[in-house]
């Protein structure tokens, strides 16, 4: 791999990482930026850099320290940068198409692949071509584990391959080219060219064992790959080395100089291809390429009651049923007649955030008698379990019909601003941690992308006879909540909407409960 610059930033006391990044994005001799990052000192500059890299389609590959608590502590003490939440960095990187490397070898392998490729594939559609059945099977399995797309060959391609391969070979993608082709550069080149000419294939991967101990066919393989590479100028080729430790370094250099990257081992090779695939797919999503970076705010916070939280949402364009706060039995009767049955009644208090824990919620109330009993019981429970809480009254609302339970939340990162979280309710988010996190603001494409990232997305799409959920209404709700968070980026700390019911397609969504925590102004 060739370098335009190799920069050691030290402790970044004078020139910061964001300054180097900005310079390298503008530098025409730098094709790919590989960066070790401990933290960000200037989030506004960092945002501007990522926006520019995205506009120029210049890949940025980052090895970010701080996946563990000790890693975060070490990074913070080293440079004084804010390490920040690791998941927040993942979300910011995803928004701007930044590739996050797992370790130093992954950083190098991915940067080398992107820097050496003559052109990038137009879409993620790969073919792996190997010289043995074992290597072909490994390529198929490892590619599958990394989500690599292997399209089927066309009938025309299959016919051509059948004509050139031995009778015992069965052409498919990934392709076992058999050892018969590696002793003839013309035959080897013809096999690769046939595959690369298939309209469904955008990039080829040739698996080789280029060991110092097996050199008989090295020149033939190099020449065959080079010829194919020249015949298909609009599609990239890469070589996968199956034996990294003993590979022929001279041959690797010949490939690299010809513009054909050599990927080290299947582990790092397919991980680099996965990064490449993600980078290409990022272009297919229309992104709001900006963040909601907050100004400095007070350390003091105040939790809003459910009614106050919902009122805040309603005032900012988020559809929600406010209900009524009853402070007397007479008001219970008045509001019950206005709302209609069945009802839900809840304790309304800024001091009781988890109402169910104190017996402060009564569901499915079907008559005035039950409503009056619920009023008395909720007040008694609150007095018993939260005697010091100030009670504002009893919140009365229409009982929502059951739907698919989702959770939507917001949490404001001190550097990058509000992050929107979405996941299935209940055990999916609590036990399986099946949730997606993404920076505000977001649009409908990004909201849908978040939902599709959930392991449980199939449940929303209709599963085993259940109707598909109203995904359009759900993404619309996510965008409205994102817009709200963007407007309140300087004052909002947290927002939790759990549960949010999603109904069948065409029937909408409904927020059942909401809790907002706001930063208080300095006095």
Residue ranges: model-predicted function:
Residues 1-523:
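Catalytic-core regions of core metabolic enzymes
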């Amino acid at each position: 791999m060739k370098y335009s610059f190799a920069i050691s930033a030290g402790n970044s006391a004078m020139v910061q990482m964001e300054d180097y990044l900005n310079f390298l994005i503008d530098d025409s001799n730098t094709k790919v930026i590989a960066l070790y990052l401990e933290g960000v000192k200037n989030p506004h500059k960092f945002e501007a850099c990522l926006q520019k890299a995205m506009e120029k389609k210049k890949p940025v590959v980052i090895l970010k320290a701080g996946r563990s608590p000790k890693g975060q502590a070490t990074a913070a003490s080293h440079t004084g940068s804010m390490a920040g939440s690791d998941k927040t960095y993942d979300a910011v990187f995803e928004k701007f198409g930044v590739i996050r490397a797992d370790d130093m070898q992954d950083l190098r392998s991915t940067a080398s692949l992107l820097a050496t490729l003559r052109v990038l594939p137009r879409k993620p559609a790969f073919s792996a071509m190997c010289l043995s059945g074992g290597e072909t099977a490994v390529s198929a399995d490892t590619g599958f584990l990394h989500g690599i797309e292997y399209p089927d060959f066309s009938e025309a391609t299959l016919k051509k391959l059948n004509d050139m391969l031995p009778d015992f070979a069965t052409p498919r993608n990934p392709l076992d080219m058999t050892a018969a082709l590696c002793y003839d550069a013309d035959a080897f080149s013809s096999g690769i060219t046939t595959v690369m000419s298939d309209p469904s294939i955008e990039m080829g991967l040739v698996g080789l064992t280029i060991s110092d101990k097996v050199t008989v066919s090295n020149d033939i393989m190099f020449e065959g790959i080079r010829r194919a590479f020249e015949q298909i100028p609009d599609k990239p080729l890469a070589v996968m080395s199956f034996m990294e430790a003993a590979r022929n370094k001279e041959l690797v250099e010949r490939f690299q100089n010809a513009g054909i990257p050599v990927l080290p081992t299947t582990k790092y090779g397919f991980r680099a291809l996965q990064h490449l695939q993600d980078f290409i797919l990022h272009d297919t999503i229309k992104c709001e390429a900006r963040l909601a970076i907050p100004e400095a705010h007070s350390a003091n916070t105040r939790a809003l009651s459910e009614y106050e939280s919902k009122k805040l949402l309603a005032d900012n364009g988020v559809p929600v049923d406010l209900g009524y706060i009853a402070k007397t039995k007479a008001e219970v009767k008045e509001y019950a007649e206005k709302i209609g049955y069945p009802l839900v009644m809840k304790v309304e208090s800024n001091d009781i955030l988890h109402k169910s824990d104190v017996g402060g919620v009564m569901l499915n109330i079907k008559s005035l008698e039950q409503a009056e009993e619920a009023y008395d019981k909720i007040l008694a429970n609150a007095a018993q379990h939260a005697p010091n809480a100030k009670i504002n009254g009893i919140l009365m609302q229409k009982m929502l019909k059951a739907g698919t339970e989702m959770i939507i939340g917001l949490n404001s990162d001190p550097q990058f601003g509000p992050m929107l979280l979405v996941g299935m309710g209940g055990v999916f988010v609590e036990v399986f941690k099946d949730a997606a996190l993404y920076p505000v603001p977001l649009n409908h494409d990004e909201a849908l992308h978040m939902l599709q990232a959930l392991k449980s997305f199939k449940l929303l799409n209709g599963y085993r006879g259940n109707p598909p959920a109203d995904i359009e209404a759900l993404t619309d709700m996510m965008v409205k909540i994102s817009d709200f968070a963007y407007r309140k980026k300087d004052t909002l700390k947290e927002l939790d909407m759990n549960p949010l019911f999603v109904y069948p397609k065409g029937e909408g969504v409904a927020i059942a409960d909401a809790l907002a925590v706001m930063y208080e102004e300095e006095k």
